[in-house]
From Swiss-Prot:
It comes from Aliivibrio fischeri (strain MJ11). GO terms for molecular function: ATP binding; lysine-tRNA ligase activity; magnesium ion binding; tRNA binding. This is Lysine--tRNA ligase. Belongs to the class-II aminoacyl-tRNA synthetase family. GO terms for cellular component: cytosol.
């Protein structure tokens, strides 16, 4: 903000504070009345009366009480906005004079209540005749001049309340988000899943490979960690006999900011006993088609230059096959087998040839995943399940019966990004013990995102976890797809931001 703009804004704020002082003196009150009650919403009025003629409305003489924020003044008309939409209010000359005398006029951003008969203008727009009115809240700060297009991205995220006032697209995105979460919840309950809540603070971080946030519990005098995933607690519940559970809640990962990443984000995780990862893929297809149709009215929708189709069966291919498909001219990749993947020198050579910056502590499985991420992932625009993840990057997933180098795991991609991760759960306590120990060794070798050893979880597995499949779905990324937005900040109400200078 330039110095001149700041001075102009300060002047407007001072003027509006003066108006509020005038209102308090004139009304002998605090200037914020709380006794007006509306009985109608703009959206409902438009739906019910929008098709009626001017003459029909005059004959009806339907009196309504509305309330909302003044977004524009056009001659005698005020454009009032509230949660359901917009509607006009008409101030006759005597009313305009009263408004000036009582309130020193109304400003853009003020919140008012209006009561009067519903009419239609010569242009066919509904309006409420201002027979009774009250200024409910004086806006002391001016809105951006062009209320139809706040374009300062920093302001949009730092002052989301302003963004929601002035940007229809932002309001729509968060309405869709709310409906998506509700639709997923209803779908899961209809499928016999029980919604649960598990701890947000963990003594041992687990359930995913990520760097945690650390906090301290003063009374217990112990360090605790904001959860990176609820997985291990949810599987404890399956051990306890709750055979179908799900949770929609926040996870926290102490990582960087990007168009796809926010340190706190929303996941839906669910676990079902007596199922495998194939059942998860089938359920995911049904869920996403149902959610898209119920929220947006169609299972096909635009995303950038593409049309994403959530209907029908989704593509399924192994990670190795996907790498080959999107590197048709790379002879070493085309000749690659799982035996070759176990050759670290070969994998390092291939990774470098496709411009992957290799870390010294990466395993062969990590190298395969990085090659996939660099060359194949961005090209997966349509819903696709990528399967056969190496065991060394899947410490909680069940090994494949035919090839113990890989697991019965998939990740789900749409629009060139991962949206979900699922697998048949590892329920062999001894194998899990060994994999936890391998993760500890990896952490000691420099991998900050490797998992900790969780002895109590091993104890739970020793009591017996039935054959189980589990999955996590990133709500934020799913909403990005359903709203055709390309940065996660546009679908999180208050995203994490770097401190202002």
């Amino acid at each position: 903000m330039t110095e001149q703009v700041q001075l102009d804004e300060n002047k407007l704020i001072a003027e509006r504070r003066g108006k509020l002082d005038h209102i308090r003196q004139a009304c002998k009150a605090n200037g914020h009345p709380n006794d007006f009650r509306r009985d109608s919403l703009a959206g409902d009025l438009q739906a019910e009366f929008g098709e009626k003629t001017k003459e029909e409305l005059e004959e009806l003489n339907h009196v309504v009480a509305i309330a909302g924020r003044v977004m524009a003044k056009r001659g005698p008309f005020l454009l009032i906005q509230e949660v359901s939409g917009k509607i006009q209010a008409y101030a006759a000359k005597e009313v305009q004079k009263e408004l000036k005398d009582k309130y020193q006029g109304l400003d853009i951003g003020d919140i008012i209540g209006v009561k009067g008969a519903l009419h239609k203008s010569g242009k066919g727009d509904l309006y409420v005749n201002m027979e009774e009115y009250v200024l409910l809240t004086k806006a002391l700060r001016p809105l951006p001049e062009k209320f139809h297009g706040l374009t300062d991205q920093e302001m949009r995220y730092r002052q989301r309340y302003v963004d929601l006032i002035v940007n229809d697209d932002s309001r729509h995105a968060f309405i869709v988000r709310s409906k998506v979460v509700a639709a997923i919840r209803n779908f899961m309950v209809d499928k016999g899943f029980m919604e649960v809540e598990t701890p947000m603070m963990h003594v041992i971080p687990g359930g995913a490979s990520a760097r945690p946030f650390v906090t301290h519990h003063n009374a217990l005098d112990v360090d605790m960690y904001l959860r990176i995933a609820p997985e291990l607690y949810l599987k404890r519940l399956v051990v306890g006999g709750f055979e179908r559970v799900f949770e929609i809640n926040r996870n926290f990962r102490n990582e960087g900011l990007s168009p796809r990443h926010n340190p706190e984000f929303t996941m839906m995780e669910f676990y079902m006993a007596y199922a495998d990862y194939n059942d998860l893929m089938d359920l995911t297809e049904e869920m996403l088609s149902t959610v898209a149709t119920s929220v947006l009215g169609s299972d096909k929708m635009p995303y950038g230059e593409h049309t994403v189709d959530f209907g029908g069966k989704y593509a399924r291919m192994s990670m190795l096959d996907a790498i080959k498909q999107y590197n048709p001219d790379h002879s070493e990749i085309q000749a690659l087998t799982y035996e070759g993947v176990k050759d670290r020198d070969l994998m390092v050579s291939i990774a470098k040839s496709v411009h992957v910056e290799v870390e010294s502590f990466w395993t062969c499985g990590q190298l395969l995943e990085e090659i996939f991420g660099e060359t194949a992932e961005p090209k997966l625009m349509q819903p696709t399940f990528i399967t056969e993840y190496p065991a060394d990057i899947s410490p909680l997933a069940r090994r494949n019966d035919d090839n113990d180098f890989i697991t019965d795991r998939f990740e789900f991609f749409i629009g060139g990004r991962e949206v979900a991760n699922g697998f048949s759960e590892l329920n062999d306590a001894q194998d899990q013990d060994e994999r936890f120990k391998a993760q500890v060794n990896a952490k000691e070798s420099g991998d900050d995102e490797a998992m900790y050893y969780d002895a109590d979880y091993i104890t739970a597995l020793e009591h017996g976890l039935p054959p189980t499949a589990g999955q996590g779905i990133g709500i934020d990324r799913l909403v990005m797809l359903l709203t055709n937005t390309h940065t996660i900040r546009d679908v999180i109400l208050f995203p994490s931001m770097r401190p202002q200078a």
